[in-house]
Structures are given as C-alpha cells and as structure tokens.
Amino acid sequence: MAAGLLPSARAVLALLFLGLALLSVGPAPAQALHNVTAELFGGEAWGTLAAFGDLNSDKQTDLFVLRERNDLIVFLADQSAPYFKPKVKVSLKNFSALVTSVVPGDYDGDSQMDVLLTYFPQNHSNNELGAVIFWGQNQTLDPKNMTILNRTFHDQPLIMDFNGDLIPDVFAITNESSQPQILLGGDLSWHPALTTKSKMRDPHSRAFIDLTEDFTADLFLTTLSASNTFQFEIWENLGGNFSIRSVFEKPKNLVVVGQSAFADFDGDGHMDHLLPGCEDKDCQKSAIYLMRSGTGQWAPVLQDSSNKGTLWGFVPFVHEERPTAIPVPLTLHIGDYNMDGYPDALAILKNTSGSNQQAFLLENVPCNNASCEEVHRMFKVYWDLAGLNLIKDAMVATFFDIYEDGTLDIIVLSKGYTKSDVAIHTLKNNFEADAYFVKVIVLSGLCSSDCPRKITPFGVNQPGPYIMYTTVDANGYLKNGSAGQLSQSAHLALQLPYNVLGLGRSANFLDHLFVGIPRPSGEKSIRKQEWTAIIPNSQLMVIPYPHSVPRSWSAKLYLTPSNIVLLTAVALTGVCVFILAIIAILHWQEKKADDREKRQEAHRFHFDAM
C-alpha cells in the first residue's frame, strides 16, 4: 500500500475501534417501570386479580379476575391489543356470595383446566367457606357444569398433590373434623390427611414445597401451640407418606406475624423461609426474618423501613367476622426482578404517620450489617422506583411475565375504582442488563402424545414440582438456584404456573437442571430427572410421563431472544456493514494508488528510453 494512504487508513480504523468499544459498553441498565395498563386491558382494567393459568392451552398465561363480589372473568391472552380480553365468565350470583379465592387446576385428571372457587355465603353466620368447582371443557369453562363440595372450610384450602398422582387435591380443615382433611382429585372423595394436636392458624400460609432437599414436596403448616403461640411445622414426605419432622416458633421479636413465603434467598439451591411481620401491634416497626434451610435459626433481612424521615410499615391483617371484601393478609410476593439469581420481593407498606399505602420493590442485595451476616444477603427497599411510586392506595402487588419474554413485570391492585372493586395497574419492567434466565414449567404428565383432542395440557397448573439448576457464573464460581412450582394457593398467593430463574450475567449453558415431582404412598425411589447443557434465555416445558419412569420424561425447549440479543444482532449487523464499507473504501483507494504507480512507471520507462 502507498505510504500516503496510511493516515486515512489509521483514521478509518480508529473510527472502527471506537464503534466496537461503544458496542461493548452497551446501554446502561434502565431502572424505570413503564405503565402499559391501557395497552393490555383497554378500558377493562378493574377487578381483583385472583389467579394465573393457561385456560385455553395456547402457551400464554391468562388472568382470572373477580368482579362485583361474585363474578369470575377470565382474561385470555391475545396477539392484538388489548392483549388481555374478557372472554370467559362464570358467576355465583345465585349464591349471593362473596368469592374469596380462585384456584385453577385439573381436578378430575382429564387434562383440562378446571377452577375451584371458595366463597362466603350470604348468611355466613358460622364464618365458614363454601366451595364449588367449575369443570373445564374444550379449553373453556361451562357455567352450568359445576360441582358444589359437600363440606365447608374453616379457611381457604391449600391445593397440593397429596397422593402423588399429579391430580391436584384439596387440603383443608372442614366442618366435619378439627383434623386436616384431604379431598382427592379425580373421584372427589374425602379422607383424613394428618393426625395432629395443633390448631391451624387463620389466616394460614400452608405450603407444599421441598424443605428437606430431596426433590420431593413436603407439607408446611402454620399452627398454634397449646399456649396459643405461633409455630410452624414441617411434615416430611417419606416414601409418599407425611410424618412430622420439625416444629419451630416464630421470631421472639415479632408481635404481628404475616404470611410465610419461600425462596432460594441466598442462591445455594435450597429453599429458605421468609417471614414478614411487625415488632409492635401497630406495625410502627416492621421486619422480615429469614430461616435458612436446615439451620433452625431466624435472622433479620429487613429492619430499616424509613425513608427521608418518613417511617413506613406493613399493613396488619384485620380479621372480620363478616367481610365485605376479600381479606388481604400481610404477604410478600417473590420474583427475580433483575435476573441476578437472587429472588426479590414486592410488599405493601403504609405511611405510619399518614394514610397512604404503596407497593415497594424489596431488592435482594449483599448483606452490609452484622444482623444478617450469617445469611450473606438482605432486602433493601427500592424507595424511588419510577412508575411504582405513582400508584396510591395499593392493596396487592405481584410479579408476572406480561409479554412472555422471561422478564418479570409487575401488577398492582389499588383501591378506589368502585366501592367493591379495585383498579388493575400493569407495569412493564424496563430493566436492561447483561443478565440471563431460564423459564421452567412442569406439566401434569397425565398424557404425552395421546392427550385428548391432541392438545398438550400446558395450563393445568400443577402444584408440587421442584426445580434446581447448577451452572458457573461469570467469575468461574459454581452457582445454584432453585424454586418450587405453585407451592401456595390461599389468600391471594398469586403464584405463577411457571418459574423464572435468574442466571445473572453468565451466558454459560446450565450444567445441570433437575426436576422432581411428588410420589405416591409406598414408593421409595425419588422421582427426579436431570437435563444438561440448557441454553440460557430459554423456556423449558417438562412433561413427566410416565410419572414413575423419570428417564422417559421429555422436555421441550423454546428459545426466547432477549432485547439485549436483538440489540446486539442489530449492532453487529451495523458493524459488519461498516467494516464492508471500510474494506470497499480501502480497496478503492488501493486501486487508485496502483493505477497512479503504473502511470508513473510508464512515464519513467519512456524517459529512460529517451
């Protein structure tokens, strides 16, 4: 190349390297939330969101919304705006009832989603709940095809898989006995569940989740001791039978006790027990305690709830004999907002010196004080999250993957739409960072390729499966994560029928992903299967068929390109075009230089000849 071209080439190459440097830096993480309520619901954004599930088996999650005390409206996900449309309706108006809970599930084992409703009858003099099941047919609900259960409940039931047949069962205290009873799905027959001297707490926060690290869901109960002290019991699933393993009390400092929640808080692959509450009866001083798996010791992970001189606290549960609206206990809703592999939470806090209550994001961050040193992590309240702090009089806040892209967005319910109904707000999570995820849903496995009408039952909402992964993080260290599927069902638990597990900034394949399901009485071997080399940013649908032969289970993998991947593809295409342009320019300049040199050589030849 001619020497005269070097400066221009250096300039072009400098521009190229500058572009590549800017590409490698990428956009700064966005923290704001974008309100997309009108885009999702149009003018229908009201009612109490009570449950999630895929009613019509189209692999998109639908919303179950209660309106006007006794109507259930199912908003089906659609491809065009508004993206959730009210398509299915069933009503208990003839019962003059207040519906208190909605639990979708396949209660007869036909691979169609049914819906269990609990309700207060109009004359609820004994304060007990009635229950009715609307049966699914042709991927919808038939308002006339229903079964009224012949027993009433002392509290909202826990939906679990008691006998390991992967048909949901109903666990509750009924009017027939002070001992827990189980309504087995399929034949709808009642049986004694457990024999215990403990009295069940109301409102309870029972759970069906693996707490003994064997991939088999155990039974967690919230009870009262003989001295009326709050306590917790773990009934271990041993060979398909439940036997009591441990009993422990609440933290001594807590006066008001909220609903237990479960998450792999410290990212070690095992479930931890989170307990929100207050250290005084007026909730002037709120806290969240954590019991790490297997330790038996409580440690505070949130104690400071003041912001700029204003003290915020949890909203204590008020027990009403004759409620006029759905009671909402003190609850945390768990989800990995920023996909860093450490689950965050949403909570409702009230200004202790005023009347306003708002939803706040509690971010899971490394511990920075002595009290949480043992668990290494803590919650930090995100006080100024744009979008969330604009919603006043919030009642409930939960996570939901609105656009099925693996990012957990936020839904908030707030008072004030009407006297008996609330407003729905949906906030898109604009968090953009170099983080990855895997989304896992475990189906019932009641059928595989021979499902009725050839429709795979994506939406049967299966309680009990347990998921764990192991991978290597960006620094080369081993990283674990775990979650239980639909472990709680009562008191607006609002758990998703899938799990989104954050992987942090590691784009490595998941080395191992394990899935375990409940097993029936008498079966000693654990039902667990392992998959290897799972691609990040993918959705895995596990079909555990047949149940007792894990090596025969199948998994369908769906890739979900994130915005980062798409932006990178666009930027890479731009860089390639830029490089081709540079090559063309340099080639053209090289050709010009060669032509000039040839002319000079020709002139020199003629001069020498003369």
From Swiss-Prot:
InterPro entries: FG-GAP, Integrin_alpha_N, Tip. Residues 1-32 form the signal peptide. It comes from the Eukaryota. The keyword Calcium does not apply. SUPFAM superfamilies: Integrin alpha N-terminal domain. It is found in: Secreted; Cell membrane. GO terms for cellular component: extracellular region; plasma membrane. It is a single-pass type I membrane protein. Glycans are attached at N35, N94, N123, N138, N145, N150, N175, N241, N351, N369, N480. FG-GAP repeats lie at residues 98-135, 153-183, 256-291. Keywords: Cell membrane, Glycoprotein, Membrane, Repeat, Secreted, Signal, Transmembrane, Transmembrane helix. The chain crosses the membrane at residues 564-584. Interacts with RUVBL1, RUVBL2 and alpha-tubulin. Belongs to the TIP family. Modulator of T-cell function. Has a protective effect in graft versus host disease model. This is T-cell immunomodulatory protein. The lineage of its organism: Eukaryota, Metazoa, Chordata, Craniata, Vertebrata.
